[in-house]
Amino acid sequence: MLKKSILPMSCGVLVMVMSGLLDAAEITLISHKTLGSQLRDGMKLATGRIACREPHDGFHIWINASQNGKVGHYIVQNNRETKHELKVKIGGGGWSSSLIEGQRGVYRQGEEKQAIFDIMSDGNQYSAPGEYIFSVSGECLISRG
């Protein structure tokens, strides 16, 4: 199932949410209102939910943007001026980075029908005016074997 939406955030971030085409994952995202342009490390910019209708063993989510050195950490460009960047990370309770080299995003094991995740500020930073657009993708993990 493919679900797209664009949600404006008061700090000038736009988010597009997508789920994988080959699985039964559904992703929703709700933006958090932020006051001002100063972002503290770990400040929640959005909270998302990935849901799987079919039997599964876990979840995998990632942001479709340039990675910022560590798995689950990203750099999003400002659409007005590309010299302005927003550093974000994806995760939350129960989510962990991939141990497989080259994999991006974070994983969570479990057979629950849904899991909650957060998009957060990665470090203390200033958010310049403009739009920061990125997409979040995800999939339901099924053991093969």
UniProtKB/Swiss-Prot annotation:
Q: What is this protein called?
A: Protein AggB
Matching entries from Pfam families are given as:
AfaD
Swiss-Prot/TrEMBL keywords:
Plasmid, Signal
Q: Which InterPro entries match?
A: Adhesion_dom_sf, AfaD, Dr_adhesin_sf
Q: What is the lineage of its organism?
A: Bacteria, Pseudomonadati, Pseudomonadota, Gammaproteobacteria, Enterobacterales
Source species of the chain: Escherichia coli
Q: Which residues form the signal peptide?
A: 1-24
The family assignment reads:
To E.coli AfaD.
| The keyword Signal is annotated on this UniProt entry | yes
Has keyword Lyase? no
**Gene name linked to the record:** aggB
